[in-house]
């Protein structure tokens, strides 16, 4: 079992303490977002005024481009997609033609870049790279409905080829 994070923002990680207590799993996250894991409470207070008083586990594994994570017979490759956060990633399984896209790319939109460490320049570079993936790749974003590379290239105003 794995606890993987597409990036280090609080809304994707504030349950890490419970998962660690229940299952002994610590998050696996890109090395450039490790510091964000240490500021989950501060992020929640700044962004939504929520007080998260929990001891979050440190990262178990720091990921980089082309690292792999195996779930049974499925192998997911880490694809760096910085912009929404410095260490944003896709987890891509070529055999299943699916990618977990986190907050980099949504159906009809993209992730915000106004949080600490965000960069519109980096996000645009990531989107240019992502647009070269096969059209059939199903995307499972961190928020909202699923979509595909082809659907986003055809209809999302932020991504093209």
Language model features with spans:
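Metallo-beta-lactamase
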Residues: 42-46, 68, 74-161
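Active-site HxH/HxHxD metal-binding segment of metal-dependent hydrolases
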Residues: 1-68, 154-158
């Amino acid at each position: 079992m794995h606890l993987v994070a597409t990036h280090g923002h609080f809304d994707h990680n504030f349950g890490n303490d419970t998962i660690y207590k229940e299952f002994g799993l610590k998050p696996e996250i890109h090395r450039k977002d490790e510091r964000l894991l240490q500021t989950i409470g501060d992020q929640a207070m700044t962004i939504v005024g929520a007080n998260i008083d929990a001891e979050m586990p440190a990262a178990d594994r720091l990921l980089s481009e082309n690292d792999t994570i195996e779930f049974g017979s499925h192998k997911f490759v880490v694809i760096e997609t910085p912009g929404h956060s410095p260490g944003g990633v896709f987890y891509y399984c070529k055999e299943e033609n699916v990618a977990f896209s986190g907050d980099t790319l949504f159906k009809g939109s993209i992730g915000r870049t106004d949080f600490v460490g965000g960069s519109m320049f980096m996000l645009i570079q990531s989107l240019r790279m992502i647009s070269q993936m096969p059209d059939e790749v199903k995307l499972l974003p961190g928020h909202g409905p699923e979509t595909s590379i082809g659907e986003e290239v055809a209809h999302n105003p932020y991504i093209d080829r």
